[in-house]
Design a protein with these regions (language model features):
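An acidic- and aromatic-residue-enriched active-site/binding cleft used to recognize and process polar
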Residues: 21, 65-67, 157-159, 188-193, ...
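Signature for HUH/AEP ssDNA processing cores
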Residues: 117-190, 201-209, 362
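Active-site loop/lid in soluble adenylation, ligation, and acyl-transfer enzymes
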Residues: 2-147
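Short beta-strand
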Residues: 62-64, 185-191, 232-236
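Structured core elements
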Residues: 17, 61, 153-155, 186, ...
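Flexible loop/turn segments at secondary-structure boundaries
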Residues: 25-26, 69-72, 162, 194-196, ...
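C-terminal accessory nucleic-acid interaction domains of nucleic acid-metabolism proteins
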Residues: 1-42, 52, 56, 133-151, ...
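Helical (often loop-to-helix) elements that flank the catalytic cores of nucleotide-handling enzymes
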Residues: 81-110, 163-181, 199-228, 248-273
């Protein structure tokens, strides 16, 4: 097949060159037509205002699939950051990027500085799409304060035996709890089987504080719904449980951004919703590149998300009052104060550990 000629798309005052516009990024499915690279770029132009409202002025990691996405492809890099799969995360702004793009200098868990793309205009997202980006992973901070998150993120992750319907039920319990605590949550589909709930907060707390707030809320959810778990090790989670991934609130940890595409069949979108609309969703695949622009034409369900920024105090009290203590951090983090041993339960020799999970000195 002959290589298609590059085209130029206009995005505000910018012109963005799109190479190989006819490349098939998503193959057709029973419920959605195929998607080309140009259509991906046009999608982000179409949802640009809502996309920027949710993720604007934030540093963002790019999940890139330069050759398009197919089932069976892998997303991976090695320990040195080199691409080893079909897709990869791009955290540093690539060399040769247009000089009009803005960056934010963020720190990794090991205090290594990285200049990441900062989403300051729709054209930046379209340029990233031209570079193969399907999913944007924005930080929970804005460029004005890179050390103080302005949102709490609740990532409800169904385990293999659980379904989207299970996640939706737990999300309703989370909504009820948040409202009891005087907090307002804004839900979205993850673009797969999960659900994300965002709570705007005042940028007055550290990443660790926000993580502890998520743990506190998760433990109260565990008390109210026995399918919810905050267990870090997979061996300790029930197969049909909903894992609240509290570590997604740490520095350099992100979830798929609102209105992002996901590398799944049918070009699904991580779609913001009202609680009422979410309660009606049976199959999140119905919200995809082809259908979301029309859905959004009825109005941005997160239009008022920035109107109120909440305090974390009520959630931090849950963290302090409910039993359980500190939980494990991700493996790329240095050992943290008070953290339990990083030993998988399946690899522990029972007599070497006390009932609190601490290694017994020999």
């Amino acid at each position: 097949m002959a290589k298609s000629t590059a085209v130029v798309v206009t995005v505000g005052d910018r012109e963005v060159r799109v190479s190989s516009p006819d490349r098939v990024v998503y193959e057709a499915t029973d419920w959605a037509p195929e998607v080309t690279k140009l259509q991906v770029c046009e999608y982000f132009i179409g949802v640009g205002s809502a996309f920027m409202h949710a993720s604007g002025d934030r540093p963002v990691a790019l999940e890139r699939w330069p050759g398009g996405w197919r089932e069976g492809m892998t997303l991976s890099v090695d320990a040195t950051g080199r691409q080893t799969g079909d897709g990869f995360y791009s955290k540093r702004l690539p060399k040769g990027a247009p000089d009009w793009l803005e960056t934010c200098r963020v720190l990794t868990p090991n205090d290594r500085p990285i200049d990441e793309l900062c989403l300051t205009e729709v054209a930046a997202a379209v340029w990233a799409a031209q570079m193969g980006t399907l999913t944007f992973h924005p930080w929970a901070v804005r460029k004005t304060d890179l050390d103080r998150p302005d949102e709490l993120r609740l990532d409800l992750d169904p385990q293999p035996g659980a379904t989207f319907t299970d996640a939706r039920r737990v999300a309703a319990v989370a909504r009820e709890l948040l409202e009891e605590l005087g907090l307002r949550g804004y839900p979205k589909t993850s673009g797969n089987r999960g659900i994300h709930i965002y709570v705007r907060i005042r940028p007055e707390w550290s990443f660790d504080d926000v993580r502890h707030a998520a743990i506190g809320l998760g433990r109260e959810l565990e008390r109210r719904d026995d399918s919810v778990t905050t267990a870090w090790w997979k061996e300790e989670r029930g197969d049909a449980s909903i894992f609240l991934d509290f570590n997604q609130n740490l520095r350099d940890r992100t979830v798929a951004g609102a209105w992002s595409l996901r590398p799944r069949p049918g070009a699904p979108v991580s779609t913001p919703m009202t609680w009422e609309r979410l309660s009606e969703v049976e199959d999140p695949r119905a919200f995809n590149l082809h259908t979301v622009p029309e859905y959004l034409a009825d109005g941005d369900p997160w239009a008022d998300i920035d109107e109120t920024a909440h305090s974390l105090d009520v959630l931090l009290r849950l963290w302090e009052e409910l039993p359980g203590g500190e939980l494990n951090f991700p493996p790329d983090y240095p050992k943290m104060p008070g953290e339990p041993p990083r030993v998988q339960p399946s690899k522990k020799v029972a007599e070497h550990w006390d009932e609190r999970g601490n290694r017994i000195a020999e």
